[in-house]
Amino acid sequence: MKISILGTNGFLSTAIAKYANEVGWTLNMYGLDAPIDCEYSNFYKVNLMDAELDCSGLMDSDLIIYAIGAGIQANLKEGLNLIYNLNVTAPVTICNKLKELNYQGRFVTFG
């Protein structure tokens, strides 16, 4: 199985990536920084606040997990624009783009 995780070093993305490592799945990671606590096949640096994600690289994934988020940790003071864009706008935009491209796998979002 080939999975792509959007979000690299958060609690959720790390836990899912470690599971993917255990079961031997091909793992592509997308985020601001390379994953620290898991192995991965490919890392793609993306900043969803700067540019829209090119979804064409996701099309051969059996499963895409959106685990990017903002405003979750009380100790971080993140602006409302960042919180709304990462938790609402970006996942909806990606979902719509995947639909346009006739993506046949599963898209799961926690945003």
Describe every region a protein language model picked out.
Residues 37-51:
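Rossmann-fold cofactor-recognition segment
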Residues 48-86:
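NAD(P)H-binding glycine-rich loop region in Rossmannoid oxidoreductase-like domains
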Residues 12, 34-39:
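Short, charged/polar "capping" segments at the starts of alpha-helices
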Residues 3-23:
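N-terminal Rossmann NAD(P)H-binding glycine-rich loop of SDR-like oxidoreductase domains
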Residues 92-111:
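Conserved Rossmann-fold NAD(P)-dependent oxidoreductase catalytic core, especially the SDR/UDP-sugar
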Residues 6, 30, 67-68, 107-111:
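SDR active-site strand-loop-helix element
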Residues 25-34:
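Conserved glycine-rich Rossmann-like NAD(P)H-binding loop of the short-chain dehydrogenase/reductase
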Residues 2, 62-63, 106:
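Structural motif
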